Curated annotation (Swiss-Prot):
Binds 7 Ca(2+) ions per subunit. Binds 1 zinc ion per subunit. Ca(2+) 1 binds at residues 269, 271, 273, 301, 303, 306. It comes from Serratia marcescens (strain ATCC 21074 / E-15). This is Serralysin. It is an enzyme of class 3 (hydrolase). Naturally present in the silkworm intestine and allows the emerging moth to dissolve its cocoon. The lineage of its organism: Bacteria, Pseudomonadati, Pseudomonadota, Gammaproteobacteria, Enterobacterales.
Length: 487
């Protein structure tokens, strides 16, 4: 029997985005499509939900074995190891976390608490704690260990009668462990090991020091650092590009995993939150102040009217506001995603040629400078092209219904364009959309009506062949039928 699975081989050309109109929107809407029987790089593709379950396949939580979705209160500490010469693995040269390490570890803990119902409380070094942090410098035979990075134990790990759950250990010979920073591998290491201490496994059955595993050994295609910081493998295997930077906080599949274990934190960022430039998140990894400062994150947001502000970047960007989607931001690829169940309402592009795709909410999309492509999707959207030759794309009557119409706020006659080509494509007719002086009730009729008193043009279209138009866009400015449409 012939396989029904869709096979995709990741190459550079897979992610060469279309640059104009509907094709650019369609490319972005299908960017990093996953699950549903797809195979990528010869491996089964897992959905976000499947990946989250696989990362938690050991079924260990601090609430007990297979006790899922329940909140938890945990303690943590930074022991001084004054009276300990060897840890449980036989490593020596033990030392207390420095002030810098402690600060970065607390930020990593905070990033997990942001997305799940976990409360962390610090206790004194000598007190028993659920999660502990410590450095080592020599391996079991007594050699200075420059090969390993760190390791940790899942909850309820019992070895030779000892409960090792929650212990996390770090090789202080590694400079990024000794001096971790936001975009450095050290910060990711802290967040990764805390993930283990909370109950997360690697996305595949591998561990450092056990053989020589590679991406070819993965269980599913999305086992990369584009989808999970619990992964060992580069984001480039799935077409991402973090530009040599590393995530500091849980990524898309990590959020699904940790919320499966402890439930979602529905008190995180419930107000009107801005991510990127002009950020009010109070989180370093969700904020940037310059074109050279890149962001790598998965957005978890519990409410409010929220904005992706990537206005300070000069590279061409592709911004998708749909849940479980990926965006290319600040010259990187697939470096920003949105967790399941999250609605981000607004997006601001930079000075490059951007593609911005909205969702079913009432979006405000601003292209900024450059030749941008804007697609609001459902909802009553406000579209601002900004300077440059911009294209406003529509693909369904529901994108801009008369009762909830979109507004194009800054249309430039003879420069910008309105793309209705998908309606012709769907009707399999090159002239389905045709402009008329009045409606007769025939499907595909389009009419422009300009009101000079308020400088607003109504674009009405009868998509379904009803008695009245079922599609209406309000446009500030005049529109020329001959030059301003793509059909």
């Amino acid at each position: 029997m012939q396989s029904t699975k869709k096979a995709i081989e990741i190459t550079e050309s897979n992610f060469a985005a279309a640059t104009t109109g509907y094709d650019a929107v369609d490319d972005l809407l299908h960017y990093h499509e996953r699950g549903n029987g797809i195979q990528i790089n010869g491996k089964d593709s897992f959905s976000n939900e499947q990946a989250g379950l696989f990362i938690t396949r050991e079924n260990q939580t601090w609430n007990g074995y297979k006790v899922f979705g329940q909140p938890v209160k945990l303690t943590f500490s930074f022991p001084d190891y004054k009276f300990s010469s060897t840890n449980v693995a036989g490593d020596t040269g033990l030392s207390k976390f420095s002030a810098e390490q402690q600060q970065q570890a607390k930020l990593s803990l905070q990033s997990w608490a942001d997305v799940a119902n976990i409360t962390f409380t610090e206790v004194a070094a000598g007190q028993k704690a659920n999660i502990t942090f410590g450095n080592y410098s020599q391996d079991r035979p007594g050699h200075y260990d420059y090969g390993t990075q760190a390791y940790a134990f899942l909850p309820n790990t019992i070895w030779q009668g000892q409960d090792l759950g929650g212990q996390t250990w770090y090789n202080v010979n590694q400079s990024n462990v000794k001096h971790p920073a936001t975009e450095d591998y050290g910060r990711q290491t802290f967040t990764h090991e805390i993930g283990h201490a909370l109950g997360l496994s690697h996305p595949g059955d591998y561990n450092a020091g056990e053989g020589n595993p590679t991406y070819r050994d993965v269980t599913y295609a999305e086992d990369t650092r584009q989808f999970s910081l619990m992964s060992y493998w580069s984001e480039t295997n799935t077409g991402g590009d973090n530009g040599g930077h590393y995530a500091a906080a849980p990524l898309l599949d990590d959020i699904a995993a940790i919320q499966h274990l402890y439930g979602a934190n529905l008190s995180t960022r419930t107000g009107d939150t801005v991510y990127g430039f002009n950020s009010n998140t109070g989180r370093d990894f969700l904020s940037t102040t310059s074109n050279s400062q890149k962001v790598i994150f998965a957005a978890w947001d519990a409410g409010g009217n929220d904005t992706f502000d990537f206005s300070g970047y000069t590279a061409n960007q592709r911004i998708n506001l749909n849940e479980k989607s990926f965006s290319d931001v600040g010259g990187l690829k697939g470096n920003v995603s949105i967790a399941a169940g999250v609605t981000i309402e607004n997006a601001i592009g930079g000075s490059g040629n951007d593609v911005i795709v909205g969702n079913a909410a009432n979006n405000v999309l601003k292209g900024g400078a450059g030749n941008d492509v804007l697609f609001g999707g459902g909802g009553a959207d406000e579209l601002w092209g900004g300077a440059g030759k911009d294209i406003f794309v529509f693909s369904a009557a529901s994108d801009s219904a008369p009762g909830a119409s979109d507004w194009i706020r800054d249309f430039q006659k003879g420069i910008d364009k309105i793309d209705l080509s998908f309606f012709n494509k769907e009707a399999q007719s090159s002239d389905f959309i045709h402009f008329v002086d009045h409606f007769s009730g025939a499907a595909g009729e389009a009419l422009l009506s300009y009101n000079a008193s308020n400088n607003v043009t109504d674009l009405s279209v009868n998509i379904g062949g009803h008695q009245a138009p079922d599609f209406l866009v309000k446009i500030v400015g005049q529109v020329d039928v001959a030059t301003d449409f793509i059909v």
